[in-house]
Design a protein with these regions (language model features):
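Membrane-interfacial terminal anchoring regions of lipid-handling membrane enzymes
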Residues: 1-215
Length: 215
């Protein structure tokens, strides 16, 4: 499954007219804009999503129900809160994605009395990192919100946003994200509300705090 997209054009004429002393900053800025446009024209394949899920687990292994749930949420997030109008995504259902990844031998299935375990071992795990990295920017905000609750059960919405804004310059430069700090803050709030709607997180009755479910 191969699909090519064309990104939005970045005009070169204004750049060529700049003073020579501005050349290096201009090239850096142009490179950032080109990379942002490449990111905004991403196509999400089944293997991208499977890699994102499995490589995010401690031992690169996940139960089939958990993987199905992750794939379903990931697809729905991209549909409900699109990264940009040029991003497209596989039409496969989550179960079809798993079957496809197994058929292509990107992952393995180990039978278990409590349910099948799907994993990526050896070279497959290394190669899958390429597919995960190609779509990391699409899930940067959701990943940040989720990260906040790895070691915290309850945080204020404002706290999640504030900490994210402090980290955002690094995320922006590493992943070539398109938003400014205020846009990132709004995006963070949107993603948090989306996770609440999907019962991944819960929000206090006054709307101030977010909580993850008790284990």
């Amino acid at each position: 499954l191969i699909k090519a997209h064309s990104g939005e054009k970045a005009p070169l004429l204004p750049a060529s007219a700049e003073r020579p002393s501005w050349f290096n900053p201009l090239v850096d800025d142009l490179a950032d804009r080109i990379q942002q446009r490449i990111n905004q024209a991403a196509h999400v394949t089944p293997i991208n999503l499977v890699a994102l899920a499995i490589l995010g687990t401690p031992k690169h292994a996940i139960s089939r129900p958990d993987l199905l749930r992750f794939l379903e949420l990931s697809q729905q997030l991209l549909r409900d809160l699109p990264y940009g109008p040029r991003v497209s995504m596989t039409e496969m259902a989550p179960a079809e994605m798993i079957d496809y990844a197994l058929q292509m031998e990107w992952i393995q299935c180990k039978p278990h009395p409590l349910g099948d375990v799907l994993s990526a071992e050896g070279e497959s795990g290394v190669l899958l990192s390429y597919f995960r990295n190609n779509i990391s920017h699409l899930f940067a905000v959701a990943g940040w919100v989720a990260c906040c609750f790895l070691n915290n059960r309850r945080l204020s919405v404002a706290g999640v946003v504030r900490m994210g804004q402090q980290l955002y310059p690094f995320l922006k430069s590493e992943l070539f994200l398109p938003w400014d700090e205020e846009e990132f803050a709004r995006r963070t709030e949107q993603v948090a509300d989306w996770l609440v709607d999907r019962e991944v997180l819960s929000k206090s009755s006054d709307g101030v705090f977010l909580s993850r479910p008790r284990e």
